[in-house]
Regions:
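C-terminal non-catalytic regions of proteins with extracellular/luminal or membrane-system context
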Residues: 1-166
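Short amphipathic alpha-helical segments
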Residues: 171-179
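A short, well-structured edge-of-sheet supersecondary motif
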Residues: 179-195
Length: 195
């Protein structure tokens, strides 16, 4: 199963990330969403770690909005501690940064996608990258540390198949049901969309 954890000190984070969260839930289903928008105590971090029992993979969304005179350009230190503790769980974790890309440490990060924004177009693009619906071709416009320098990026082609092989979809029963329903005038017609 999948967990989606949103970490931010911004009061509007859940609303800003609504499109991304909705796409995750709609695409995967049965997603455990955890929203954290305050600093975490040790007990709070342990509670989240406990909630990860039975979780096979996690998507973590970070939202740090850099605003004038706020003095914050990275995630809260207790959120960084949570990331360190989650790495020890040995489950695949992908982190999406919406807003500021800076972290106190990148040692706990397995997969990191920086979007620099939290608008609707960015949310859709992030969801498309997560599910392999579009190519990944971005590169860093800034230096994050001595390892991840400006221009660094990983190129990845979109998925056009399922689980390593071309999709061979055959719906003879579905067509039969539709034809029968139309013939019996249950409904006047049908449209079929396969994504």
């Amino acid at each position: 199963s999948l967990a989606h954890i949103i970490l931010s000190l911004d009061a509007g984070a859940r609303n800003y990330l609504k499109l991304f969260s909705s796409d995750i839930d709609r695409t995967h289903g049965h997603v455990k969403e955890i929203f954290v928008n305050n600093p975490l105590t040790e007990l709070g971090r342990q509670d989240i770690i406990t909630q990860m029992e039975g979780i096979d993979q996690a998507v973590i969304s970070l939202l740090v909005r850099i605003r004038m005179d706020k003095g914050i350009s990275t995630i809260d230190s207790t959120h960084s501690l949570l990331l360190s503790e989650m790495k020890k769980l040995n489950i695949p974790i992908i982190i999406f940064s919406f807003g500021s890309p800076y972290l106190p440490s990148y040692n706990t990060v397995e997969t990191y996608v920086c979007t620099y924004n939290y608008g609707s177009i960015t949310m859709q693009a992030a969801a498309d990258v997560l599910w392999g619906r579009s190519d990944v071709n971005g590169s860093l416009p800034v230096n994050l540390n001595s390892k991840y320098l400006r221009g660094f990026g990983i190129l990845k082609k979109k998925r056009n198949n399922g689980w390593g092989q071309r999709l061979q979809i055959n719906f003879p029963d579905a067509w039969g049901v539709l034809d029968s329903a139309i013939e019996n005038k249950i409904f006047p017609g049908a449209q079929v969309f396969i994504a």
